[in-house]
């Protein structure tokens, strides 16, 4: 049962060209007859051992636009700069949040102190009205 799910084996380019229909691999003359001396490989495929490819030129013109033009060191530096800016912005955001929290905590502590003072003064007033003196 596992053989059913096994992917097909990879084929070489020559095997793939041999699998193409005969009409695709033979070129036709202007009269429409097949030319048996033509190569079985279509002409639109680049030759792998062409001298212009060995000189280091790009095989496809699109590759030069996709390929990164910067060297790896510059790419590393730009990536590091991006990471540093991200870290500094996150640090600034955290610092702002901490400042806000400090302000809120300071206000809450002040409110707690005023509430304690108000409770003590109310307790003293109640004691004076009832005639108790527990603070002595």
Curated annotation (Swiss-Prot):
Compositional bias per record (Polar residues), positions renumbered to this chain: 24-38
Glycosylation site residues: 86
Location relative to the cell: Virion membrane
Keywords: Glycoprotein, Host-virus interaction, Membrane, Viral attachment to host cell, Virion, Virus entry into host cell
Region: Disordered, residue numbers: 22-50
CC terms in the record's Gene Ontology section: membrane; viral envelope; virion membrane
Chief site of localization: virion
GO biological process: fusion of virus membrane with host plasma membrane; symbiont entry into host cell; virion attachment to host cell
Functional summary from the UniProt entry: This protein appears to play an important role in virus penetration at the level of cell fusion. The N-terminal proximal region is essential for fusion ability. Essential in fusing the outermost of the two Golgi-derived membranes enveloping the virus with the plasma membrane, and in its subsequent release extracellularly.
SUBUNIT field: Homotrimer, covalently linked.
Assigned protein family: Belongs to the poxviruses fusion protein family.
Protein name: 14 kDa fusion protein
Native source organism of the sequence: Vaccinia virus (strain WR 65-16) (VACV)
């Amino acid at each position: 049962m596992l053989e059913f799910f096994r992917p097909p084996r990879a084929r070489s380019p020559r095997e793939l060209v041999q699998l193409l229909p005969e009409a695709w691999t033979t070129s036709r003359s202007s009269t429409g007859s097949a030319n048996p001396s033509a190569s079985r490989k279509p002409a639109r495929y680049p030759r792998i051992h062409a001298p212009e490819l060995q000189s280091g030129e790009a095989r496809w013109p699109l590759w030069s636009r996709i390929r990164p033009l910067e060297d790896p060191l510059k790419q590393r530096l730009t990536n590091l700069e991006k990471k540093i800016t991200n870290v500094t912005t996150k640090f600034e955001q955290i610092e702002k949040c901490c400042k806000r929290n400090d302000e809120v905590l300071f206000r809450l502590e002040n409110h707690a102190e005023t509430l304690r003072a108000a409770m003590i003064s109310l307790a003293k007033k109640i004691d004076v009205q009832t005639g108790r003196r527990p603070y002595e």
